């Protein structure tokens, strides 16, 4: 040992590494000694170190190794002696260190365990490097772990004062001394424990006292080493050597030892691998991973001095890897917990340890680990960073070679165990030094101190910080990521190490001898690169895939029609044709356009061209989607919308081929057969034109006016959606037709305008039809959305497209939905059934209904066109509103005609804006209802009912009759009768709605696009991106949020169940209210009916003209309801109520004659839509009427609770719907100024409207139409509508009002409950939704059945799961629209209603029962019931979209309102009924239906109340 020490001194004198304070003197010597000692160690260690290491190996990994190592070391002391002697003989501290590292690891650990004994502890302290012990343990962590951590561990764990002093001194020295000093000391101490400790004292501790202590300890430990500690001494030497010598001895003999080490590595790869866990070689083998793993290796320094020194080398070479020090710490903990990983970890640790040693000089500086680990830092700090690191590398390499060789020799006999032990010792010392020091008394403390030194010792932390600063300085902080990466990489690396490590170790050996860590880095880098190659695919891929589907324009195609079972497809002409049909390309659509142009009239041809043009994604339709590639939904909207326009433009198209053709033939035949057939035969041959022509010539005129009026509003919306296109088209169309501003706006508008003109001309003659055709042609040319105009021509291409390619505009989910054939089959069957049902009424009606149905279906299929058609729908809405204004002149027939036109127009327009156009159509129908009780109600209700029930003509008329009965005339039934005629339109519309449900299911975004365009496309575009995925969601959102489909971000959730979709407010409003929705049809019908029915009930009050004004006007209309004429105008505005999205439309509608009573209030409210919403909340007390209106709404909300009558259930629906409205209102405040205006028009605008409603309620109650007035305020929100309806009921049922108020409160609470409600809906799944739908569908259907025409409205399919699903999907959009409309008013109502509930209760109770109790209440009941019915439908629609909420939160405004409404509705429902929301909905629907029946019973207020009582009981 003295010789070794002398040699170490000589080596220090030689100072291979002069830069290293101690190592420069001792490095060469130490390395030589280490080499020789390593050789000797190999010779001796194989004998004894095997048992020692064997005993220790299990203990090291466990951290218990040191104590057993003690005894084994004590048993193997001779071998440590021999090892030490061999180092002495070899006079190489490197050899001694290596030997000590191998056999001395156990002994060193035992010595460290012995440091519990004063002798061993003094020795270890004396050798703070404990070079033999330290090297043994510290080859893995020679410098930083062994010295600093070992000393520190001794200090902490070992009560021995010497250790504590030396640990403190070491810490001080580490702070003072460079790692090189420690390395020299470690080398010297390892080589000669005495001199090594002197070096430790001098260099590590930085003062000779430590050397004296080291001498004393050497002397004391020398006997220990000779006696019991020789092995331990050798271990200390090995550790110290490993620390200092691996760092500096290796640095001293970097070339020599490294070359030898390389040779040795090549000779014994596996052993070297094992040794590598402890040796520099392990650093080479595991440097990269270990560096990564132990770059943060404050603890790693504890793992092994040799590893630490090696790591120092690599860390100084790989400063960038030091950030893994923290990972090393983490791995230390892992190793401590998982000793089995030690073998792998020591390697990583040795790599990381050395890297960390060099990087984290700090750890070696504070603890030995800080010195070795921070050696690079210190070296960098002391200008020895690289040189020392190189030296360290070389010395460590040498030392590791020596150690690796001897341990390899030792590993050969005991290398596996010893090297494993040594690895584990390193790992343990690095990671399990706590355990090692704990078992060893010093080692446990050592690792603890290592951790403490890392964490607690400011020097360690500082050095760690230094390491972080120096490059691997982020030792602790980055371990989280690094840990995963390292561990994973370590594993990979281990795998590579076993297979590639020999080669790479050789390369690394060769490279480290080069001494540049950069070489090591290069070598490490390959592994890192290798690891990099193992990167997992980014999660973004799914989004890419989804976006890809989203962007697919041809996603309109029903992919479901493709047989997925066909693994291989023979692309025969038939197949290609099939696929071309399924997925029409540009050429296909161009061909289609050409075919349409050639097969259809000139007007048809332009429309078809446009439609084909756009669906072909060739020009407008496809190119805009291409332009909007980012917003692929928007593209789809455009494409589908155009297709929808095409479809809607052609009833045949809507019918998909046969249906469309049949409908078109029927239409043409029926239209021609009709006096207006000539006109319809003209360009007006479009579905809407034929139907309209069939229906009414007065209606044509009214519709022309309505179209005119609607055109500007629609223009506004179209400008919003497609400003350039819509404006150009509008301008061109406008220039072409003064009477058809809507037509100018968009194909739907064109269609509507042209149809209106055609109808207007139909009565006058065919000249107007030709003019319409010409203008329509012009429109087709000018308007991108032209296809809507040519319904007849459109059917061909649409029929081909629909038949060949049931276009699912919804995108991928839409395709999936279509694949389920829900939307496609349902649409087709619904359209067909509905056409058949509607055909019951009359051939013309049937044709009309059938054609519109087909148009609707095709429109729905063409959701992309719907986006474009949204403009048309908006314009059409405006037209409808205009017609509503003009409508009063032509009350019934004009209304029917208009209704038919509207239905036709909607058929076309609905294709243009599935939701919006449907809503517009519905609204137009509502307008028609308002305008013409039969037609409008038939159209709106029929549309809704067709939507809901796939309805038969009888089903549509009942609602139409109901609506018409409610508001068209004092006699409610009479308008209901006209429902069947309108039902054809409605049937068509329903077909469209069904198709909308289906297509909405397949192309929710399309419907959303329609709705957005119609209402607040721009505002809710953001919420619309997922619409295509979530049909129900889309339907609710389609009016408000179709444009957001452009946002493909949310669409990336194909599942549509990600909270991503809910992050928008739509999350809250969307799901709970939507899930139970009866069906898209019911919801849509409900929206339209609620708008139209409420408005219609309120009887086309001018308030219906504009959403806000509709309410006011509806109030007037209630008064005017007896005056069917004024009521119809208001109904036109009611249609505009749906047009609430179009503030301009609303404003325009307000301009209608119906504005007479509420025009100013509506204007005010529209103007103050957002303010009015707040004012709505506050205005309930503003005026009795407002309070009453609020009360009505609140009553409707509360009625479920307060009322024990049937009214209570509808109020429950109202309350249910109110949350949606409220949420929607909330969102409307932000998103829909006009919506809010509308809501305000209904609610806030009801200071006038409500006062008017109070009056109108009173008057209408007197006149039998007050319900409409009450409904109109209710219409502010869905709940508002219901509130009015329920207000009507409270008129005859005060408890209803109270219950509504309670439900309103429940509504507000339900918002908060809706997440669970959504979850319950989700949990219940479609079962709940279906249950709700069935409850809503059947009750809606039954009451309609009760009314006889209600049956017509609710076809048997309405209860069918498919139809229910469609209702959920398709009903949501109108619900959303209505909810959006009512959302503003609904939120206002919810707030205002709460205030006005008492007032409303008193007023409604007073006014309604006081006024024509039977007739007024009857109408009110009907209105309320119908509203409730629609509200329930809406509620169900809202509930239905629970999955919509799941699907998407694009409809944040609508969705949130809807969800809130759903939640609130459920809350109210539960509050008023403590029953399952489903049952409540069912009963509420039943009560609504019973109320409707009672209403259908005209003035039978008692009956209605009885019904109410019955259903309240049910509730």
Curated annotation (Swiss-Prot):
Residues 1180-1193 have a biased composition (Low complexity). InterPro entries: DUF4683, Nexmif. Residues 381-405, 1455-1479 have a biased composition (Basic and acidic residues). It is found in: Nucleus; Cytoplasm. Keywords: Cytoplasm, Developmental protein, Neurogenesis, Nucleus, Transcription, Transcription regulation. It comes from the Eukaryota. Residues 381-415, 505-529, 731-774, 1158-1225, 1372-1422, 1435-1479 are annotated as: Disordered. Its main location: nucleus. Coiled coil: none annotated. Expressed in the brain, particularly during the late embryonic and perinatal stages of development. In the developing brain, it is expressed only in the cortical plate and subplate region but not in the intermediate or ventricular zone. GO terms for biological process: negative regulation of cell adhesion mediated by integrin; negative regulation of cell-cell adhesion mediated by cadherin; negative regulation of cell-matrix adhesion; negative regulation of neuron migration; nervous system development. Residues 1442-1452 have a biased composition (Basic residues). Disulfide bonds: none annotated. One of its GO terms (cellular component) is cytosol. Residues 746-757, 763-772 have a biased composition (Polar residues). Involved in neurite outgrowth by regulating cell-cell adhesion via the N-cadherin signaling pathway. May act by regulating expression of protein-coding genes, such as N-cadherins and integrin beta-1 (ITGB1). This is Neurite extension and migration factor. It comes from Mus musculus (Mouse). The gene is Nexmif.
């Amino acid at each position: 040992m003295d010789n070794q020490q002398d040699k170490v001194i000589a080596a220090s004198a030689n100072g291979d590494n002069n830069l290293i304070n101690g190592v420069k003197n001792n490095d060469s010597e130490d390395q030589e000694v280490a080499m020789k000692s390593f050789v000797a160690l190999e010779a001796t260690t194989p004998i004894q170190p095997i048992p020692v290491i064997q005993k220790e190996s299990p203990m090291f990994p466990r951290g218990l190794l040191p104590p057993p190592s003690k005894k084994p070391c004590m048993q193997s002391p001779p071998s440590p002696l021999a090892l030490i002697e061999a180092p002495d003989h070899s006079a190489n501290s490197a050899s001694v260190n290596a030997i000590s590292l191998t056999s001395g690891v156990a002994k060193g650990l035992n010595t460290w365990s012995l440091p519990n004994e004063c002798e061993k502890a003094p020795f270890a302290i004396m050798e703070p490097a404990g070079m033999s012990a330290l090297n043994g343990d510290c080859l893995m962590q020679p410098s930083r772990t062994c010295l600093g951590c070992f000393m520190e561990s001794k200090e902490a764990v070992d009560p021995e004062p010497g250790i504590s002093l030396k640990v403190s001194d070491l810490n001080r020295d580490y702070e003072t001394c460079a790692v090189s000093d420690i390395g020299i000391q470690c080398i010297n101490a390892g080589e000669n424990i005495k001199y090594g400790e002197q070096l430790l004292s001098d260099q590590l501790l930085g003062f000779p006292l430590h050397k004296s202590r080291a001498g004393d300890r050497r002397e004391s430990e020398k006997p220990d080493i000779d006696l019991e500690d020789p092995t331990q001494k050798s271990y200390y030497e090995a550790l110290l050597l490993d620390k200092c010598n691996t760092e500096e001895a290796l640095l001293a003999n970097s070339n020599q030892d490294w070359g030898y080490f390389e040779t040795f590595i090549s000779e014994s790869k596996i052993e070297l691998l094992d040794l590598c866990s402890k040796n520099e070689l392990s650093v080479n083998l595991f440097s990269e991973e270990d560096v990564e793993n132990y770059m943060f290796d404050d603890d790693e320094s504890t793992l092994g001095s040799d590893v630490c020194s090696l790591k120092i080398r690599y860390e100084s070479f790989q400063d960038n890897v030091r950030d893994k020090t923290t990972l090393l710490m983490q791995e230390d903990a892992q190793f401590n917990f998982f000793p089995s990983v030690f073998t792998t970890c020591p390697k990583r640790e040795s790599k990381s340890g050395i890297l960390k040693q060099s990087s984290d000089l700090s750890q070696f500086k504070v603890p030995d680990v800080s010195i070795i680990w921070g050696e690079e830092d210190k070296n960098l700090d002391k200008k020895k960073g690289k040189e020392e690191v190189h030296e360290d590398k070389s010395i460590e390499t040498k030392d590791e070679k020596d150690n690796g060789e001897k341990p390899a020799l030792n590993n050969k006999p005991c290398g596996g165990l010893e090297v494993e032990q040594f690895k584990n010792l390193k790992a343990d010392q690095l990671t399990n030094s706590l355990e090692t020091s704990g078992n060893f008394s010093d080692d446990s403390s050592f690792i603890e101190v290592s951790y403490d030194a890392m964490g607690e010792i400011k020097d360690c932390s500082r050095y760690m910080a230094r390491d972080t600063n120096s490059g691997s300085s982020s030792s602790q902080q980055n371990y989280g990521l690094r840990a995963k990466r390292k561990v994973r990489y370590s594993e990979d690396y281990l795998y590579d190490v076993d297979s590639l490590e020999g080669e790479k170790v050789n390369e690394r050996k060769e490279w480290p001898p080069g001494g540049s860590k950069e070489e090591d880095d290069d070598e490490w880098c390959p592994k890192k690169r290798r690891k990099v190659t193992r990167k997992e695919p980014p999660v973004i891929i799914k989004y890419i895939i989804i976006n890809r589907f989203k962007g697919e324009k041809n996603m309109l195609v029903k992919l479901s029609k493709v047989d997925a079972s066909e693994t291989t497809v023979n692309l025969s002409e038939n197949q290609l044709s099939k696929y071309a049909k399924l997925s029409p390309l540009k050429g296909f659509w161009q061909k289609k356009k050409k075919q349409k142009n050639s097969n259809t009239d000139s007007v048809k041809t332009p429309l078809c061209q446009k439609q084909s043009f756009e669906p072909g994604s060739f020009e407008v339709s496809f190119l805009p989607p291409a332009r909007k590639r980012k917003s692929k939904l928007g593209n789809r909207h455009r494409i589908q919308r155009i297709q929808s326009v095409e479809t809607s433009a052609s009833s045949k198209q809507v019918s998909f081929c046969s249906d469309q053709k049949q409908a078109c033939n029927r239409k043409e035949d029926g239209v021609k057969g009709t006096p207006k057939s000539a006109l319809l035969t003209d360009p007006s041959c479009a579905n809407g034109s034929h139907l309209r022509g069939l229906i009414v010539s007065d209606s044509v005129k009214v519709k022309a006016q309505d179209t005119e009026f609607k055109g500007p509003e629609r223009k506004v919306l179209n400008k919003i959606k497609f400003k350039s296109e819509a404006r150009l088209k509008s301008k061109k169309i406008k220039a072409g037709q003064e009477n058809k501003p809507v037509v100018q706006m968009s194909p739907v508008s064109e269609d509507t305008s042209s149809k209106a003109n055609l109808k207007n001309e139909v009565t006058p003659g065919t000249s107007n039809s030709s003019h319409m055709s010409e203008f329509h042609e012009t429109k087709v040319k000018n308007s991108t959305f032209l296809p809507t105009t040519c319904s007849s021509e459109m059917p061909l291409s649409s029929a081909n497209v629909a038949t060949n390619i049931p276009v699912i505009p919804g995108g991928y989910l839409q395709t999936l939905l279509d694949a389920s054939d829900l939307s496609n089959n349902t649409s087709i069957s619904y359209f067909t059934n509905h056409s058949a049902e509607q055909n019951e009424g009359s051939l013309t009606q049937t044709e009309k209904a059938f054609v519109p149905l087909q148009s609707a279906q095709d429109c729905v299929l063409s959701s992309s066109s719907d986006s474009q058609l949204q403009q048309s729908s908006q314009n059409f809405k405006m037209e409808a509103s205009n017609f509503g204004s003009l409508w009063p002149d032509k009350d019934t027939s004009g209304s029917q005609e208009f209704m038919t036109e509207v239905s036709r127009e909607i058929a076309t327009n609905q294709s243009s804006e599935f939701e919006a156009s449907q809503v517009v159509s519905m609204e137009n129908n509502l307008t028609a209802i308002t305008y013409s009780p039969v037609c409008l109600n038939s159209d709106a209700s029929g549309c809704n009912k067709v939507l809901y029930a796939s309805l038969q003509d009888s089903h549509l008329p009942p609602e139409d009759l109901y609506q018409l009965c409610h508001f068209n005339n004092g006699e409610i039934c009479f308008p209901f009768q006209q429902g069947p005629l309108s039902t054809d339109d409605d049937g068509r519309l329903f077909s469209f709605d069904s198709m909308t449900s289906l297509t909405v299911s397949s192309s929710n975004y399309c419907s959303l696009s329609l709705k957005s365009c119609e209402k607040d496309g721009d505002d809710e575009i953001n919420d619309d991106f997922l619409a295509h995925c979530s049909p129900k969601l889309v339907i609710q959102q389609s009016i408000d949020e179709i444009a957001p489909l452009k946002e493909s971000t949310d669409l990336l959730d194909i599942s549509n169940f990600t909270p991503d979709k809910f992050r928008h407010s739509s999350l809250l409003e969307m799901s709970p209210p939507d899930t139970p929705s009866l069906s898209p049809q019911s919801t849509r019908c409900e929206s339209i009916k609620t708008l139209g029915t409420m408005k219609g009930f309120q009887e086309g009050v001018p308030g219906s003209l504009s959403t806000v004004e509709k309410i006011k006007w509806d109030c007037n209309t209630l008064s005017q309801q007896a005056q069917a004429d004024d009521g119809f105008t208001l109904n036109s505005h009611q249609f505009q109520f749906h047009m609430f999205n179009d503030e301009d439309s609303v404003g325009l509608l307000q301009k209608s004659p119906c504005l007479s009573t509420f025009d100013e209030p509506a204007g005010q409210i529209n103007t103050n839509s957002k303010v009015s919403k707040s004012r709505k909340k506050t205005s309930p007390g503003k005026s009795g009427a407002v309070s009453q209106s609020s009360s009505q709404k609140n009553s409707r909300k509360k009625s479920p609770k307060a009322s024990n009558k049937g009214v209570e259930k509808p109020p429950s629906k109202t309350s249910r719907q109110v949350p949606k409205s409220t949420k929607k209102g909330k969102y409307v405040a932000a998103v829909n100024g006009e919506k809010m205006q509308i809501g305000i028009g209904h609610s806030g605008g009801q200071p006038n409207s409500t006062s008017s409603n109070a009056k109108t309620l009173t008057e209408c109650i007197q006149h039998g139409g007050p319900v409409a007035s009450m409904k109109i305020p209710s219409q502010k929100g869905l709940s508002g509508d219901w509130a009015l309806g329920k207000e009507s009921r409270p008129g005859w049922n005060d408890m209803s009002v109270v219950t509504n108020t309670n439900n309103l409160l429940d509504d507000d609470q339900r918002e908060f409950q809706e997440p669970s409600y959504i979850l319950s809906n989700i949990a219940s799944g479609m079962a709940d939704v279906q249950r709700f739908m069935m409850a809503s569908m059947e009750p809606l259907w039954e009451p309609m059945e009760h009314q006889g025409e209600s049956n017509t409205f609710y076809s048997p399919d309405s209860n069918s799961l498919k139809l229910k699903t469609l209702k959920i999907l398709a009903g949501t959009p109108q619900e959303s629209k209505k909810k959006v409309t009512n959302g503003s008013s609904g939120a206002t109502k919810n707030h205002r209603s709460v205030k006005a509930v008492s007032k409303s209760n008193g007023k409604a109770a007073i006014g309604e029962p006081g006024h024509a109790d039977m007739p007024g209440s009857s109408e009110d009941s009907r209105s309320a019931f119908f509203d409730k019915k629609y509200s329930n439908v809406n509620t169900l629609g809202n509930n239905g979209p629970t999955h919509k909420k799941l699907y998407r939160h694009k409809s944040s405004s609508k969705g949130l309102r809807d969800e809130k409404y759903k939640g609130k509705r459920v809350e109210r429902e539960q509050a008023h009924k403590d029953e399952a929301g489903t049952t409540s909905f069912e009963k509420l629907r039943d009560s609504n239906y019973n109320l409707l029946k009672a209403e259908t019973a005209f003035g039978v207020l008692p009956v209605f109340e009885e019904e109410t009582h019955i259903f309240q009981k049910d509730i």
